[in-house]
Regions:
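Terminal alpha-helical segments
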Residues: 1-128
């Protein structure tokens, strides 16, 4: 594995750990969800790097996934939800698309679960 790919995965793992710790507190669903999005983004960018391409300077998971969908298959609906989260959880309620401005506990848990599965998938694919 190329060193730059390993770096992306190490940063993804850090975001995943943060998300896992934060999601246990119902008042921290926003940062838990944000770190889930960041984990997913870094996992996808690791795959882009492994293909010898430069990752785009974007946080749009759908766009990044479009570069790697022949290599891995993931739930695009979840990527779309995480795209919304990236903006929604960083600004006051009413500025984003979420009804209450923050994800529910269940949504945050789903985001962490998705980030975990994506991290494992990418790690397994790139380790072989």
């Amino acid at each position: 594995m190329k060193p730059v790919v390993q770096e992306w995965l190490e940063f993804a793992k850090t975001d995943l750990k943060a998300a896992e710790l934060l999601v246990s507190d119902p008042t921290l669903t926003a940062p838990a969800s944000f770190h889930s999005q960041q984990c997913a983004e870094k996992c996808l960018k690791a795959v882009v790097e492994s293909m010898g391409l430069n990752p785009p300077k974007t946080h749009d998971l759908i766009r990044i996934y479009g570069m790697v969908e022949d290599f891995i298959t993931v739930n695009e609906d979840m990527l779309a939800k995480l795209n919304e989260i990236y903006i929604d959880v960083r600004y006051p309620a009413g500025m984003g698309l979420l009804p209450d401005g923050v994800p529910t506990v269940e949504e945050a848990k789903d985001f962490v679960k998705f980030a975990t599965s994506l991290y494992r998938l990418v790690l397994n694919k790139l380790s072989t």
